[in-house]
Curated annotation (Swiss-Prot):
Residues bearing the modification Phosphoserine: S199, S464
GO biological-process terms attached to the record: cell differentiation; nervous system development
Domain of life: Eukaryota
Protein purpose: RNA-binding protein with binding specificity for poly(C). May play an important role in neural development.
Name of the protein this chain belongs to: RNA-binding protein 45
A molecular function (GO) term: RNA binding
Species assigned in the record: Mus musculus
Gene label: Rbm45
GO CC annotations, alphabetized: cytoplasm; nucleoplasm; nucleus
Amino acid sequence: MDDAGGLGGSGGFRPGVDSLDEPPNSRIFLVISKHTSELVLRERFSPFGDIQDIWVVRDKHTKESKGVAFVKFARSSQACRAMEEMHGQCLGPSDTKPIKVFIAQSRSSGSHRDVEDEELTRIFVMIPKSYTEEDLREKFKVYGDIEYCSIIKNKVTGESKGLGYVRYLKPSQAAQAIENCDRSFRALLAEPKNKVSGSPEQDDYSSGRQEALGQEPRANLFPFVGEQQSEFSTFDKNDSRGQEAVSKRLSVVSRVPFTEEQLFSIFDIVPGLEYCEVPRDPYSNYGHGVVQYFNVASAIYAKYKLHGFQYPPGNRIVVSFLDDGSNMTELIRKMATQMVAAQLASMVWSTTSQQQFLQYGGNAASQAPQIQTDVVLPSCKKKAPPETPVKERLFVVFNPHPLPLDVLEDIFCRFGNLIEVYLVSGKNVGYVKYADRKSANEAITTLHGKILNGVRLKVMLADSPREESKKRQRTY
């Protein structure tokens, strides 16, 4: 168990979960030296804005700092600017190790990963249908450098749907836009485009969208990951569900009418949403809509997680596949299996037996790891013996979730001299140990910034190798 020491506004008082994440993305996560004090953190981070709380995670028994801290700002833009300017900096003249700074995930979201920069730069806005992309750019350029603007249009008529996206170059600029733009735009962070098969537990569904829908938090919408495992296992066993025609397009039926904006807000929970459409039928009191995703995996996930979802409360929506002329049965079975593995990998496994289940349990152990990527990988090579001296360690960041251990070992052993791969429990990071520096450098060159099985890897050099016992106690 961990404990935390804080330096809040009332002598160590730590706010509740609700105030910790209000407003969203206003809290940063720091990896620092174990000797860094709360006072130093306040001195270095106060120039970025109003600090509401600072606390350092400590060992429950020894009260020693674990090298992890949190800083809570009053505004999201302040936290983002602190992240942008302080990540990779040294806190003091005597410090030789640069700190790591991330936007911390909402504690009530059910997710256990940190938010990546690219998730914080694109905002979703509701605009007048008469707006052009130039009008949209003109309205939002005052908040920062815009990478692009886009307006969602009806694919048949080309008419604007009154929805748009604005992507900024920096997270702080997007946060400034959300905080300061006219309330009529209902600006909020959009789901990142590069997410392929994320889970609701991993997505940061903003509170603003929940308020617009009048719905309960997503943690209640998707309460138990075991249900998804069961559903996908059933799907993979050739029962009636497995025989259902699968496509990227979904039909949504409800006894209560809904608007395109409401439908979009519900199905944008699952990454990869392409468009929503609600046909007008003056002779029917029912709601009917069509939803299409960019990939089949997202459509499958949306179908099996949102079918039967109550919106509004008491009214269950019916979600089914619409035939789009594709036949992808075998591909879907593989995707479904991989998605189950990804879900299990992203959970917090607090015991050794649970970690062993992740690595060895279930059907995954009986199959060779499946690697889908456009990266040219070398052939598999034998691992080095566990007792081999460590010559180089790599630090790996996963977005949106860690890959399974067997897949990671299959990937990193291809460069030769691999000793061990391990994941940090509850985080989307891990370490790779090599017995040869050349092998480690080849892994960095080949894998850094690449996407494997829908997961983007950041691969970089970690600290110099130390004794295993000291290393494990150093930060976590």
